[in-house]
């Protein structure tokens, strides 16, 4: 297990003061609901005191309500006790990156992250966005393993295991560092979606074709693979 640094000073008061695990999927281009540009804009507005929180919807409220039950069901099905719920960890190298883990359990004598999820979808493998979030948590905690119990479609319960992937963690953390730099400098990351271009250039698209989100994801993955091969 890595030598980690847990927060010794008061944890951040608001989302504008740090990059959390919920931001990881956006930073690596795996959040279909938000782009890095939109995330930076939100963080900047929070820091400026001009941001208005959107109203929660039924699914969001259900997720918050069901989260503790998912952790309890994980313990019921696996026999593993979940401790340290909502514990805060800070990344050992980047003080502006941290995470609140849903819980911590002890597996074969070593601590592991527990990240609960509820979804109306069914998937045989964890979506890449969740993997990015969990790898960010593993990078912050220094743990080598995470369990992701998922309550699917209101009737199915499945527990996924995610092992630490240092190379992918570096990719995720570096992307978060990039976005945070834009937040502090009050600049914006490169536009990645049609909405980004519309927000940035509302009156002029210049006649250029925009890459699809899927194409952008593929380019991001190719860059990561190229870096991984170079470092190997």
Label each residue range with its predicted role:
Residues 187-215:
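Long, amphipathic alpha-helical segments that form or neighbor coiled-coils/leucine zippers used
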Residues 1-69:
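Charged, glycine-rich intrinsically disordered N-terminal tails and low-complexity linkers that flank
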Residues 178-189, 227-230:
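Short helix-capping and hinge/turn segments at secondary-structure transitions, especially at repeat
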Residues 207-232:
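Contiguous, amphipathic alpha-helical segments that mediate oligomerization or scaffolding
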